[in-house]
Structures are given as structure tokens and as C-alpha cells.
Regions:
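Positively charged, low-complexity terminal tracts
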Residues: 1-103
Length: 103
């Protein structure tokens, strides 16, 4: 599925969210979470954990290089939603809706 994550987060009133005078973009925030791996849960084995980390890294690089529309597999879209779950509800909802085609 093709998804453009290079869009700004907006607040409850529809205004773009900025931090230190910089607009917060979904792709940048998602990439930061994927790169840090803070959303990952411990695997049953070291091999599983290593695979999760590598998958997150590769997805981070794919989104960062796209700087716009990116073609995601079902598994990659699921990982983006899992990573976005560490955001506040407003941020998560916007990422989720973008991927799932909601409002």
C-alpha cells in the first residue's frame, strides 16, 4: 500500500503542531521511534529480538529515504502502527487513520 507519511501532525483544532518553530512531521516522528526501538517488546530469543531490531531499522531507512509516498507491505504498516502506539492518542490516531484510510 502506498502511504504518504510526510505530512504534519495537527492539533485538535486542525492547526499544524510545531516544536521549537519546526513543524512536526509524521514521517520524522515515526522514523525516530523506529530508529530508537522503544516500541519493541523483548523477543523469545535473541534471534527474534535481532530480527525485530533489523526490521525496524530497515523500515526507518525506507521511510526516511522516501521523504513522501512510500510503498509499505502489510507487515511494515503493522510495524508503523505499533511504533506510533507510543505517541499520544492524537498522534497515534492520525498515523493510524493515514495508514488505514480513515479520517
Amino acid at each position: 500500500m502506498k502511504v504518504n507519511l510526510h505530512v504534519p501532525f495537527v492539533n485538535i483544532f486542525g492547526k499544524e503542531i510545531s516544536h521549537n518553530s519546526k513543524i512536526q512531521m509524521m514521517d520524522e516522528e515515526v522514523c525516530n521511534i523506529l530508529f530508537s526501538g522503544t516500541f519493541l517488546r523483548p523477543g523469545k530469543t535473541l534471534e527474534e529480538e535481532s530480527k525485530q531490531k533489523m526490521d525496524a531499522y530497515l523500515l526507518c531507512m525506507k521511510i526516511a529515504k522516501a521523504a513522501g509516498e512510500v510503498d509499505l507491505t502489510v507487515e511494515e504498516a503493522a510495524m508503523v502502527k505499533m511504533a506510533a502506539a507510543s505517541l499520544n492518542p492524537g498522534g497515534y490516531g492520525q498515523v493510524y487513520n493515514l495508514i488505514e484510510g480513515g479520517e
